[in-house]
């Protein structure tokens, strides 16, 4: 979902191929021939697989700088983006399956880290896209963690973005397993 949002923000054409976790599509011989990791998302760039949400988003932001999804020429902010992306991948994503207190603690850290602005880096970026994707999934699970006004604000701002609306609309039509 996050990679699709970024692609819609950038405005480049792409072909999405839905993958089902329930059918174990990522473990099929055809998919493993393209991507030995068997991971999603996966982008093919010049015939080579690029996996992991953070890597795909970083690639898109650097490949299409005109979209301004990563501050150009600002090493400190770029390092903050990498810090955020690492935290999301290692501090939030793995605990999503654990539920309960683990999830609440991870989101409490994200809430404090977010600060008082509208966007994680002070302006809209790949960090907001990545953070939103996991927060969106959490909010659509039974008994979601709550009490995160900054992240709720991010959620509302993201849901208002045309790229997010378009992504949700398209992914629901192609059969992507979206939470209800």
Provide a role label for each language-model segment:
Residues 17, 53, 148, 168-169:
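Residue-level detector of family-conserved "landmark" positions at structurally sensitive sites
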Residues 76, 84-167:
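GST-like fold's C-terminal all-alpha helical module
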Residues 20, 126, 171-172:
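Short, solvent-exposed turn/loop segments enriched in Gly/Ser/Thr/Pro and often Arg
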Residues 167-180:
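Terminal-tail/helix-coil boundary detector
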Residues 25-27, 157, 177-178:
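Short Asp/Glu-rich motifs
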Residues 1-101, 105, 111, 120:
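GST-like domain detector, emphasizing the conserved glutathione-binding G-site
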Residues 48, 134, 172:
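Flexible loop residues that form catalytic
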